UniProtKB/Swiss-Prot annotation:
The gene is KIN. Residues 209-260 are annotated as: Disordered. This is DNA/RNA-binding protein KIN17. Involved in DNA replication and the cellular response to DNA damage. May participate in DNA replication factories and create a bridge between DNA replication and repair mediated by high molecular weight complexes. May play a role in illegitimate recombination and regulation of gene expression. May participate in mRNA processing. Binds, in vitro, to double-stranded DNA. Also shown to bind preferentially to curved DNA in vitro and in vivo. Binds via its C-terminal domain to RNA in vitro. Residues 209-224 have a biased composition (Low complexity). A zinc finger (C2H2-type) spans 28-50. The modification N6,N6,N6-trimethyllysine is found at K135. Keywords: Coiled coil, Cytoplasm, DNA damage, DNA recombination, DNA repair, DNA replication, DNA-binding, Host-virus interaction, Metal-binding, Methylation, mRNA processing, Nucleus, RNA-binding, Stress response, Zinc, Zinc-finger. Induction: By UVC irradiation in quiescent primary fibroblasts. By mitomycin C in human melanoma MeWO cells. PANTHER family: DNA_RNA-BINDING PROTEIN KIN17, KIN17 KIN, ANTIGENIC DETERMINANT OF RECA PROTEIN HOMOLOG. The C-terminal domain (268-393) is organized into 2 subdomains that bear structural similarities to SH3-like domains. Both subdomains adopt a similar 5-stranded beta-barrel-like fold and are connected to each other by a short linker of 5 residues. The 5 beta-sheets are packed at approximately right angles against each other. A highly conserved groove formed at the interface between the 2 subdomains, comprised of Lys residues 302 and 391 and other positively charged residues, may possibly be the site of RNA-binding.
Length: 393
């Protein structure tokens, strides 16, 4: 019987079968060969190459088992790290995704008999956090990458520095309040009883009709009054001058206190303006891929950030092809639009505010923007670095 042609249904079916997963009982782990049926597997077991592999394995079976176990563990953990990160996930979900690859290492060739035994072993070795629930075993990858540990240390250091700055500001405010209380004497009002020398005397009120009449009456009275009355008037005038001088000094003290408060507010605003973080990814911004590890297809191509994971990783969608990729922020850079386009501030005191690009300065690699959202709407900000802003999708 002749061999079937390339486009016959049988040939097409054979090629489809060869690409997909076959039954596990017809797979030879030593030779890493998958047979399609029982007859093919029987022929393979009788072949010379298979017999040679069995002889090699019989000389040192533990070495082969350790090799397969190590490969299985490394591939499983790599899939868990790349696909799920540090999220808590059911172990069966990870295993099903792992065995979907045609060239995977089968568990029956390793030192673990079941997936539960392998999960418990991961927990004992400290590679993952494992816990048992009524729905089964859940695992969580423990990231011990030096870069991740360095980021965590930097975040802890920054939090500690922020707490120190807050304590310094609180002490400064307390010192200002203490100085203000020491320089100001507290005035306690005193209440006295109304005393009348003659109970039969009537109480009268003199209401002047206007400034002219009062000034005229004063001038006429001053002409007829004696020197003692003039002394009394002079003393009352001096008392008024003293009161006015005291009120002016109090107003000056208030101005000084207000200036100190303004100084504190300026310090806080400057601190917020200069506050920076080592992460900048935000959803719905346009970024450019700068890594060459993905090939020329994605190098220097633009994409839209769809999701941010753990502050440093983003799921991006390519603008031209629509492909979705999961990349670290070190493999991305911001995109500066043309003047007049909308942007998003990614770092500094204006983080999270949308704005409009007004102009760019190519010599200093900075830009001038106008804030469009938030309480600072309408403010014009100069000297914003290129890496602190990006074009909105």
């Amino acid at each position: 019987m002749g061999k079937s042609d390339f486009l016959t249904p049988k040939a097409i079916a054979n090629r489809i079968k060869s690409k997909g997963l076959q039954k596990l009982r017809w797979y030879c782990q030593m030779c890493q060969k998958q047979c399609r049926d029982e007859n093919g597997f029987k022929c393979h077991c009788m072949s010379e190459s298979h017999q040679r592999q069995l002889l090699l394995a019989s000389e040192n079976p533990q070495q082969f088992m350790d090799y397969f176990s190590e490969e299985f563990r490394n591939d499983f953990l790599e899939l868990l790290r790349r696909r799920f990160g540090t999220k808590r996930v059911h172990n069966n979900i990870v295993y099903n995704e792992y065995i979907s690859h045609r060239e995977h290492i089968h568990m029956n060739a390793t030192q673990w008999e079941t997936l539960t035994d392998f999960t418990k072993w991961l927990g004992r070795e400290g590679l993952c956090k494992v816990d048992e629930t009524p729905k089964g075993w859940y695992i969580q990858y423990i990231d011990r990458d030096p870069e991740t540990i360095r980021r965590q240390l930097e975040l802890e250091k920054k939090k500690k520095q922020d707490l120190d700055d807050e304590e310094k500001t609180a002490k400064f405010i307390e010192e200002q309040v203490r100085r203000g209380l020491e320089g100001k004497e507290q005035e306690v009002p005193t209440f006295t009883e109304l005393s009348r020398e003659n109970d039969e005397e009537k109480v009268t009120f003199n209401l002047s009709k206007g400034a002219c009449s009062s000034s005229g009456a004063t001038s006429s009275k001053s002409s007829t009054l004696g020197p003692s009355a003039l002394k009394t008037i002079g003393s009352s005038a001096s008392v008024k001058r003293k009161e006015s001088s005291q009120s002016s000094t109090q107003s000056k003290e208030k101005k000084k206190k207000k200036s100190a408060l303004d100084e504190i507010m300026e310090i806080e605003e400057e601190k917020k303006r200069t506050a920076r973080t080592d992460y900048w990814l935000q959803p719905e911004i346009i970024v450019k891929i700068i890594t060459k590890k993905l090939g020329e297809k994605y190098h220097k191509k633009k994409a839209i950030v769809k999701e941010v994971i753990d502050k440093y990783t983003a799921v991006v969608k390519m603008i031209d092809s629509g492909d979705k990729l999961k990349l670290d922020q070190t493999h991305l850079e911001t995109v500066i639009p043309a003047p007049g386009k909308r942007i998003l501030v990614l770092n500094g005191g204006y983080r999270g505010n949308e704005g409009t690009l007004e102009s760019i300065n190519e010599k200093t690699f900075s830009a001038t923007i106008v804030i469009e959202t938030g309480p600072l709407k309408g403010r014009r900000v100069e000297g914003i670095q290129y890496e602190d802003i990006s074009k909105l999708a």
